[in-house]
Design a protein with these regions (language model features):
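Extracytoplasmic substrate-binding proteins
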Residues: 157-237, 263
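Solvent-exposed, polar/charged alpha-helical surfaces in well-ordered, non-transmembrane soluble domains
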Residues: 78, 85, 89-92, 133-137, ...
Length: 283
């Protein structure tokens, strides 16, 4: 199997991409390109918002199949269920931890200060087994998560089913089954800021992310030659693993002059077909 290496900057963006694809999206990018102390400083300096959200606020989100849905938010949410670690992290970093009424168990053990923050939240259980009834019992006025991963009939229910119950949903743009752009990573942060009426804090944070992403892109723009073949794999605490691909991960790989060796993710990977795919890099 061939061995190739990425530049330091490209490797950094690859790490960002993996986080975005597996358990961390918009705010995971933040975690990869900004330190907790920088975030805390940004939040502290933006305690008074110069912009106010005008409610009702309507944003376009996407369901599990990539269909556009107009979602209306009547007020700043006070009881939020976060089905995705990245969204939970983002709420904490924007000073909104007190709004969280429920989360799901993490796929893997967390490290650092964020681990203690997350551990103090009310976990409803494993995302594979939490019922819609359990979710509704928290009486959420907003549910956050990835559209393709969580908002299906076989998981916690569709976006439309919660909309019919009068419970607004926000699905990450960066996770949607649509043609992706790196802009969606930052746009998710801005949208959360608008939904919660903390625009100044969120926009300051988003601007900081954009600057770091732009700097990384400048460093990797010189990558040339044959695209590197990359295989992304995610391991879990129970010892299982899956290969991974998504619209956003493909978008980021293209920026690195690379491509995923899989058309789609799955858990049926064997040593034999791994060898036959002959990836240049396994992340």
């Amino acid at each position: 199997m061939k061995k190739k290496t990425l530049s330091v900057a490209a490797a950094a963006l690859a790490a960002v991409m993996l986080a975005t694809g597996c358990s961390q999206t918009a705010s995971s990018v933040a975690s990869s390109v900004a330190t907790s102390s920088e975030i805390a400083s940004s939040v502290a300096e933006s305690t008074v918002s110069a912009e106010e959200t005008s409610y009702p606020l309507t944003l376009q989100i996407y369901d599990a199949d990539g269909n556009a849905v107009d979602m209306t938010y009547d007020h700043a949410p006070e009881k939020v269920l976060s089905t995705q670690l990245s969204m939970t992290e983002l709420l904490i970093k924007l000073g909104l931890k007190d709004t969280i009424v429920g989360v799901f168990d993490n796929d893997n053990a967390l490290k650092g200060d964020i681990a203690d923050e997350i551990a103090s939240l009310n976990s409803l259980g494993d995302k594979k087994s939490v019922s819609k009834e359990t979710i509704l019992a928290t009486e959420p006025d907003l549910i956050l998560g990835k559209g393709p991963l969580m908002f299906t009939e076989s998981s916690i229910g569709t976006v439309q089913s919660y909309q019919e119950l009068g419970i607004p949903v926000y699905t990450e743009l960066a996770s949607a089954s649509i043609d992706q752009s790196l802009d969606n990573i930052v746009e998710d942060v801005r949208n959360i800021g608008e939904i919660f009426n903390v625009q100044e804090t969120a926009n300051s944070y988003a601007d900081e992310l954009q600057e770091r992403i732009d700097a990384l892109m400048d460093k990797v723009s010189s990558q040339s030659g044959e695209p590197l073949k990359v295989l992304f794999m995610a391991g879990y605490a129970d010892g299982t693993f899956v290969a991974y691909n998504s619209k956003m991960s493909s978008c980021m790989l293209n920026a690195l002059n690379a491509e995923n060796v899989l058309d789609k993710g799955g858990n049926g990977l064997t040593l034999e077909n791994l060898v036959s795919m002959n990836p240049d890099i396994i992340v």
